[in-house]
Amino acid sequence: LATSSAASDVYKRQPFNKVIVKVKRMGGGFGGKETQSNLFAVVAALASVRTGKSVKIRPDRDDDMIMTGKRHPFYIKYNVGFEKNGQIMAVDALLSANCGFSSDLSGPITDRALFHSDNCYFYPNVRLISRPLRTNKVSNTAFRGFGGPQGMMLAERIIQEIAFFLKKDTLE
């Protein structure tokens, strides 16, 4: 059985040594090749078993973009306590991530968002909670930054709001 994916094992329980996987190239952005190729792999495997021939799947870019996940959108609610000089004293935040219909890599991604939520700043008192949410959307996945940018945006937003409140420049 020749296919472009080891997923062919799922249909006929072929031993792995009977499955030939051929991949011409794996270029492009980080993340989509970790788990998001499963949909295409299963289709190729089923078609290969059904026809007894090798199968090539090449979705056009529009279909690929519709069917595969993107960066996790986050909704972040937070409270921050700070001194008159702008020094942050406490941060309490809930980071909710739209994970889509499956967990995929959402756990590590939401964890990494937490780890980067202070960016380069120091919070002497902090409570950060991540909430991965299952929704009816396409499952989101690993993307360049792997949750880090979402966490850093929290820190930068806090700095912006403190500066605005104190009528100062964010660089002060």
Put a short name on every predicted segment.
Residues 9-21, 163-169:
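Phosphate/pyrophosphate-binding loops at sites that engage ATP/ADP/AMP, CoA/4′-phosphopantetheine
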Residues 1-7, 11:
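Single conserved hydrophobic/aromatic residue that forms the stacking wall/gate
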Residues 73-158:
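Glycine-rich loop/linker segments at domain edges
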Residues 31-84, 140-165:
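Glycine-rich and small/hydrophobic secondary-structure elements
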